[in-house]
Amino acid sequence: MQFKFLSTVALATLAVAAPAPTDPTPIPPSQCNTGPIQCCNTVTQASNPVAGLLLGLLGIVLQDLNVLVGLTCSPISIIGLPGNSCNAQPVCCQNNNFNGLIAIGCTPININL
């Protein structure tokens, strides 16, 4: 059990080196109405081998492999407060977060708007 978890985490960290997909135009935080804004270490397409592996390990089947997924994400409650900054990619996801390991249906957020 621990080996499976450690393998999953190790593969998720390798995803940082994976090429990023063509990013859609970021939206302002006020347009995120599907759940809390997430801060993800990596945002990639579901067709990415690492994302596909994580989805498979979690038993998640997606119809559209071009959908953006966030890997190793954590929620940002209120932007601008100390401790709520995001040094990676802030995204708005479709409230499909699996324990922070992967979030599905993500759109980049421009927190500077």
Curated annotation (Swiss-Prot):
Q: How does it assemble?
A: Self-assembles to form functional amyloid fibrils called rodlets. Self-assembly into fibrillar rodlets occurs spontaneously at hydrophobic:hydrophilic interfaces and the rodlets further associate laterally to form amphipathic monolayers.
**Would you tell me the protein name for this molecule?**
Class I hydrophobin 1
Q: Which family does it belong to?
A: Belongs to the fungal hydrophobin family.
The reply on keyword DNA-binding is no
What cellular component GO annotations does this protein have? extracellular region; fungal-type cell wall
Organism of provenance: Coprinopsis cinerea (Inky cap fungus)
User: Signal peptide position in this chain?
Assistant: 1-17
Keyword annotations for this protein, in alphabetical order, are: Cell wall, Disulfide bond, Secreted, Signal
